[in-house]
């Protein structure tokens, strides 16, 4: 900056020397011209000069090129007019012009409209015009107001020249007319030269501005830099010379006796704008240029460019960030919003760069000192009775005490980059610390990075004993709140250089140690920096008391011991949003009441970009924890129940989370992952960090809390080891107590009984080990060492088959075993007898199933995206969720502990979490509709036969994952209309099927069948009331049809003959032999058909192993001999065999179908072959024509 200033001064001096030389030459020429003009009695006409001067005023612009181009033309015209003007023809106009020019020059030299000058002018008209600039008083420097403008205008209107006065002046000036004309011409030339000088000065300013902009482009726009020296010089010189604005300069035009326009009063204070740092620097350089020009020439009025923004009356501007700034010359510049008395000092400690490697640094912290630069002591309080650093500060503490942050533990947080991210609050008036007056303290903030010493270090190391207060000093930094340029270093993130603390012992001085380092000791750079932010904080009106006060305004308030225990035992109080609403949630399912199958979609929850692998409700039912997967990681997402509100994410795992479980008191969450760790998370407000990490050598597939003691955690790993951990909730470590290596393969699942006396572990080879796990609360480690094996379960049925999931039955006597052979088993642990549940496909994925809390139903997911429901007591499949929007296998199912609610999840691209709930009102409305439409659709050609096709209501398609309110959105009339339309569509299909049957078939069954069919009707008939009572909900779309008697026969299922032997590889396949006649119920695809053989066996069989009877008759004799068909007697015997009472088709080929029980009248029994065959045919045709929709299907 100094170089640019010196160059400007040199150029200005050179220019003025040239101008003065030119001016002296012109004066010589003018003197010669005077003599010629006197001799020839010719007067110089100044009209041309006036017109040129007026033209320059009108065309004055910021473009110096225009001025430069006009200057030669003006000079030429001026010289020509001066030499050729004739004063004899312009005597009258010249006299008027002289008077007006005198008035104009006086007004120009006194822009404030001083009345005394006007009075002197009128009182002494014979004297010459005063050329010197009058001395301005302090009143002239005051800003201009509208009232002053009005007064000045009023004065100017009264001081216009009168005709009588002009006549007297002209008479007195007749004698020396020639001399006065020359003097006036000289004045005009001086005014013209003044304008030329101003234009050249503007051109110089423009060049300086351009250079300064290029040099200052790297400064940020929101930072203000001011030079104290330049501003002080500018203030001094502004008091001497008034600055005029270009826009406020009056314009004069002389023609005849009129003056166009009026002179305006101009403010003596220059406008100051805070738009940017560049404008401030450029304006200061322009002022310095003016000052240098004033040093070389006499002070004359000069024009400067007006700032783009107007100055407010209170001298306040708004910068680009919307911050009000005080622009008074006597006060420092900082945002006005920080001057509020309600604000207090807030220091936010962000972090440091990586500290220097030192094994002695394990938990650094930052100590903040508020020191006065004048005294070296802590800053005195503005109010001695106001607590600033601590709530219990006494009045005798009249200074601001230092405050420290919390320590950052490298070991616990697994990082050597300290990130405190902590807000430190000093309850001191913020404007008091920012005052720049001599009486106010000049505040410096000192930051010390410390590490506390252990007791052993202090005892063993004598050098450490010399350390003050048992702290090891690592580095320090400082920050001045008000810089040397008067700007406040606040409201932005600052990076402070750290320095080594001096090694020499401290001298006993009465100043703060950090201040002594700053003022007297050399500063050796520490290879790191500290990031801080200082700002004014508004203190909240109400601060809740706490066990330990964290700031000066927070009260410490303790609670009784029993209140603390009650608080620890309830996890509801620790959840956000639940403390405000203290009402108890009333669940729909009463204690001891049997569970219902949920029949209404409640809402869908977001599970991340890759879906959810496992989920679980908390024991109190208020939180749903879901182990999800996203692009950035594998978070555990917590949702509030029943609202479905998102609570928070627990991030830390680096790979898929296989298992998730809650502690018995719901204070902790345990997860196991394939990243080789099991993690414990605290269920607390705003706590998203890992509480404990249990490291393992490989993948961890399962982890559980011990039901009796939450400090014991059991994990199952890929290395076939079971590990027991003791987790101290109040200490920083987890201790590995014991390891078991009984299993020969990796462990997939663990579970405990309710009391925690037994544990069950299952591995990949189908082996289940029962453990005795009784513990004593007072001696955990000793109890764990006494854990033994109770027995090993090695069933031949699932030997070598991986066990996916284990769960104890609510009665504690049975065990749910989910294996990867598409079979679920519930085993009685006393006699080791298991009941099978077939239908849910599971051959590849790790899928979890679940039992309801009452043990009434068993829910299991499948790889085909269907959820199956069984009755564990009977083994019957009672329902299925057949059209869920999942494209991936359903991984986990969780049933709510207190509500008839279930949650499903799948692991795949954008798979949601679905929650279903039981709605009694929906079930009641559907029951009424079922009764109303029972048996009211007569069909032509078919006689009384009731075909009950029972389906659950169509569930709405959830395209988006928005939470639906649990309310009734449809009225009963609207539902009735929808059901009627649905029933009409179905009955049309049945009519077409019946017409086809009546047209093509005719057969008469023997009379003996009538008695059998009547018994079958009584056994298979299941009324709507029984269905509703058993399953707790009803179905829409119920079809009840009465058929009239006819002489036509109902078509039997087509039959095929087996050409080759086939042995079933799966439980849902059919074993056939050559020559077997198979009834085909439906063709699943071109490769697999579904049917039954004469022994009552049903299942899938390959289509390429069979042929129709017609094709079989055309086969060569050698093939017929190898696979002879059944004899007519055997065939008749098979046809007359009683149909089974229960019809159940379990399908896992990605389709769902419905079975109905059919009942016939006695007249119909004589004309139809078999109830079983007719039921399968009708069911198959109905399935082909059903409408797409999401259903829960009940199977009788």
From Swiss-Prot:
SUPFAM superfamilies in the cross-refs: SH3-domain, WD40 repeat-like
Biased composition range(s): Basic residues: 92-101, 300-309
Region ranges (Interaction with HAP1): 141-434
Keyword GTP-binding among UniProt keywords: no
Entry GO terms, CC: adherens junction; cell-cell junction; centriole; centrosome; ciliary basal body; cilium; cytosol; MKS complex
Tissues showing expression: Highly expressed in the most primitive normal hematopoietic cells. Expressed in brain, particularly in neurons that give rise to the crossing axons of the corticospinal tract and superior cerebellar peduncles. Expressed in kidney (renal collecting duct cells) (at protein level).
Biological process (GO), any one: positive regulation of polarized epithelial cell differentiation
Keywords assigned by UniProt, alphabetized: Cell junction, Cell projection, Ciliopathy, Cilium, Cilium biogenesis/degradation, Coiled coil, Cytoplasm, Cytoskeleton, Developmental protein, Differentiation, Disease variant, Joubert syndrome, Phosphoprotein, Repeat, SH3 domain, WD repeat
Inducing or repressing factors: Down-regulated during early differentiation of normal hematopoietic cells. Up-regulated in leukemic cells at all stages of differentiation from patients with chronic myeloid leukemia.
Biased composition (Basic and acidic residues): 141-154, 166-179, 224-233, 1117-1136, 1161-1182
Main location: cytoplasm
Annotated CDD domains: SH3_AHI-1 (cd11812)
Gene3D superfamilies in the record: SH3 Domains, YVTN repeat-like/Quinoprotein amine dehydrogenase
One Gene Ontology term of the molecular function aspect: identical protein binding
Annotated signal sequence range: none
Disordered: annotated segments: 56-186, 215-242, 254-327, 1115-1196
InterPro entries assigned: AHI1_SH3, Cilium-Associated_Jouberin, SH3-like_dom_sf, SH3_domain, WD40/YVTN_repeat-like_dom_sf, WD40_repeat_dom_sf, WD40_rpt
Coiled-coil ranges per UniProt: 13-45
Subcellular location: Cytoplasm, Cytoskeleton, Cilium basal body; Cell junction, Adherens junction; Cytoplasm, Cytoskeleton, Microtubule organizing center, Centrosome, Centriole
Purpose: Involved in vesicle trafficking and required for ciliogenesis, formation of primary non-motile cilium, and recruitment of RAB8A to the basal body of primary cilium. Component of the tectonic-like complex, a complex localized at the transition zone of primary cilia and acting as a barrier that prevents diffusion of transmembrane proteins between the cilia and plasma membranes. Involved in neuronal differentiation. As a positive modulator of classical Wnt signaling, may play a crucial role in ciliary signaling during cerebellum embryonic development.
Protein's recorded name: Jouberin
Species of origin: Homo sapiens
């Amino acid at each position: 900056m100094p170089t640019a200033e010196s160059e400007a001064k040199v150029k200005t001096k050179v220019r003025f020397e040239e101008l003065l030389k030119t001016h002296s030459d012109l004066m010589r020429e003018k003197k010669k011209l005077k003599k010629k003009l006197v001799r020839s009695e010719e007067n110089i006409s100044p009209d041309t000069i006036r017109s040129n001067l007026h033209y320059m005023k009108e065309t004055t612009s910021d473009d110096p090129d225009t001025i430069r181009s006009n200057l030669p033309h003006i000079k030429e015209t001026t010289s020509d007019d001066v030499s050729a003007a004739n004063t004899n023809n312009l005597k009258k106009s010249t006299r008027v012009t002289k008077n007006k020019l005198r008035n104009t020059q006086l007004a120009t030299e006194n822009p404030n409209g001083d009345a005394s000058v006007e009075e002197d002018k009128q009182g002494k008209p014979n004297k010459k015009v005063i050329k010197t600039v009058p001395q301005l008083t302090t009143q002239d420097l005051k800003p201009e107001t509208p009232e002053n403008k009005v007064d000045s205008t009023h004065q100017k209107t009264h001081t216009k020249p009168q005709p009588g006065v002009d006549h007297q002046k002209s008479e007195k000036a007749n004698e020396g007319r020639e001399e006065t004309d020359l003097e006036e011409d000289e004045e005009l030339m001086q005014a013209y030269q003044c304008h030329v000088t101003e234009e050249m000065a503007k051109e110089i300013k423009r060049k300086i501005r351009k250079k300064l902009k290029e040099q200052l482009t790297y400064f940020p726009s929101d930072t203000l830099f001011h030079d104290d020296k330049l501003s002080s010089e500018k203030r001094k010189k502004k008091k001497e010379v008034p600055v005029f604005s270009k826009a406020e300069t009056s314009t004069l035009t002389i023609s005849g006796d009129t003056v166009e326009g009026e002179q305006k009063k101009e403010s003596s204070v220059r406008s100051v704008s805070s738009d940017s740092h560049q404008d401030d620097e450029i304006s200061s350089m322009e002022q310095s240029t003016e000052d240098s020009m004033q040093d070389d020439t006499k002070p004359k009025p000069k024009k400067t460019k007006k700032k783009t923004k107007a100055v407010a009356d209170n001298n306040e501007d708004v910068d680009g960030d919307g911050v009000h700034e005080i622009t008074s010359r006597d006060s420092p510049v900082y945002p006005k919003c920080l001057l509020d008395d309600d604000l207090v000092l807030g220091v936010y400690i962000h972090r440091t760069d990586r500290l220097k490697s030192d094994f002695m640094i394990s938990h650094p912290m930052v100590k903040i000192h508020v020191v006065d630069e004048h005294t070296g002591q802590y800053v005195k309080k503005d109010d001695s009775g106001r607590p600033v650093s601590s709530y219990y500060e006494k009045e005798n503490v009249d200074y601001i005490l230092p405050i420290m942050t919390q320590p950052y533990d490298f070991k616990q947080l697994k990082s050597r980059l300290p990130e405190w991210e902590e807000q430190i609050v000093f309850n001191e008036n913020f404007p008091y610390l920012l005052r720049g007056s001599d009486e106010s303290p000049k505040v410096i903030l000192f930051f010390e990075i410390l590490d506390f010493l252990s007791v052993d270090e202090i005892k063993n190391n004598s050098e450490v004993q010399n350390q003050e207060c048992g702290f090891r000093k690592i580095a320090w930094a400082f920050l001045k709140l008000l810089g040397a340029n008067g700007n406040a270093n606040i409201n932005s993130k600052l990076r402070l250089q750290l320095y080594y603390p001096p090694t020499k012992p401290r001298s006993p001085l009465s100043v703060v140690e950090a201040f002594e380092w700053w003022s007297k000791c050399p500063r050796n750079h520490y290879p790191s920096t500290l990031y801080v932010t200082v700002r004014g904080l508004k203190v909240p009106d109400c601060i809740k008391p706490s066990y330990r006060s964290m700031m000066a305004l927070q009260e410490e308030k303790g609670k009784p011991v029993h209140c603390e225990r009650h608080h620890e035992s309830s996890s509801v109080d620790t959840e956000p949003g639940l403390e405000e609403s203290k009402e108890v949630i009333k669940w729909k399912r009463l204690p001891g009441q049997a569970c219902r199958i949920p029949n209404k979609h409640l809402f869908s929850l977001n599970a991340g970009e890759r879906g959810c692998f496992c989920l679980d409700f908390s024991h109190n039912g208020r939180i749903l924890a879901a182990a999800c997967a996203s692009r950035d990681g594998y978070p555990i997402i917590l949702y509030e129940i029943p609202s479905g509100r998102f609570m928070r994410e627990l991030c830390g795992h680096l790979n898929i989370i296989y298992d998730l479980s809650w502690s018995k008191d719901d204070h902790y969450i345990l997860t196991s992952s394939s990243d080789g760790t099991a993690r414990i998370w605290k269920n607390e407000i705003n706590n998203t960090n890992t509480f404990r990490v249990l490291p393992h050598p490989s993948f961890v597939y399962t982890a559980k809390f011990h039901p009796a003691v939450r400090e014991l955690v059991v994990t199952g790993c890929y290395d076939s080891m079971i590990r027991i951990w003791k987790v101290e909730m109040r200490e920083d470590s987890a201790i590995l107590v014991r390891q078991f290596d009984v299993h020969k393969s990796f462990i997939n699942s663990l579970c405990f009984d309710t009391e925690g006396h037994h544990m069950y572990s299952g591995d990949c080879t189908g082996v289940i080990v029962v453990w005795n796990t009784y513990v004593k609360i007072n001696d955990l480690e000793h109890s764990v060492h006494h854990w033994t094996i109770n027995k090993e379960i090695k069933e031949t049925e699932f030997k070598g088959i991986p066990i996916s999931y284990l769960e104890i039955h609510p009665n504690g006597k049975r065990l749910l075993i989910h294996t990867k052979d598409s079979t679920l088993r519930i085993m009685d642990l006393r006699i080791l007898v298991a009941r099978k549940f077939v239908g849910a496909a599971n051959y590849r994925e790790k899928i979890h199933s679940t039992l309801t809390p009452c043990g009434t139903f068993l829910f299991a997911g499948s790889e085909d995206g269907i959820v199956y429901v069984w009755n564990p007591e009977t083994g019957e499949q009672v329902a299925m969720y057949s059209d869920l929007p999942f494209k991936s296998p359903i991984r986990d199912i969780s049933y709510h502990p207190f509500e008839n609610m279930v949650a499903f999840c799948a692991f795949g691209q954008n798979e949601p979490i679905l929650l279903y709930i039981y709605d009694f009102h929906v079930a009641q409305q559907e029951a009424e509709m079922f009764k109303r439409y029972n048996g009211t659709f007569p069909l032509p050609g078919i006689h009384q036969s009731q075909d009950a096709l029972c389906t659950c209501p169509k569930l709405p398609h959830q395209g988006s994952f928005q939470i639906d309110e649990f309310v009734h959105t449809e009225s009963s009339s609207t539902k009735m209309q929808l059901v009627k339309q649905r029933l009409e569509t179905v009955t049309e299909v049945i009519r077409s099927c019946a017409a086809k049957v009546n047209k093509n078939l005719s057969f008469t069954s023997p009379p003996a069948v009538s008695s059998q069919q009547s018994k079958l009707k009584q056994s298979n008939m299941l009324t709507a009331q029984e269905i509703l009572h058993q399953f707790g909900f009803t179905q829409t779309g119920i079809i009840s049809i009465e058929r009239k008697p006819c002489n036509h026969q109902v078509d039997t299922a087509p039959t095929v003959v087996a050409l080759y032997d086939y042995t079933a590889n799966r439980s849902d396949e059919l074993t056939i032999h050559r020559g077997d006649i198979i009834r085909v119920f439906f063709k699943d695809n071109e490769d697999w058909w579904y049917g039954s053989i004469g022994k009552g066996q049903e299942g899938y069989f390959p289509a390429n192993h069979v042929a129709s009877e017609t094709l079989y008759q055309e086969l060569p004799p050698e093939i017929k001999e190898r696979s002879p068909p059944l004899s007519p007697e055997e065939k008749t015997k098979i046809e007359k065999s009683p149909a089974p009472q229960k019809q159940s088709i379990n399908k896992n080929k990605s389709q769902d179908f419905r079975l109905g029980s059919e009942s016939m009248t006695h007249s119909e029994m004589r004309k139809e072959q078999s109830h079983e065959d007719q039921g399968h045919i009708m069911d198959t045709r109905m399935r082909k024509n059903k409408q797409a929709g999401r259903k829960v299907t009940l199977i009788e």
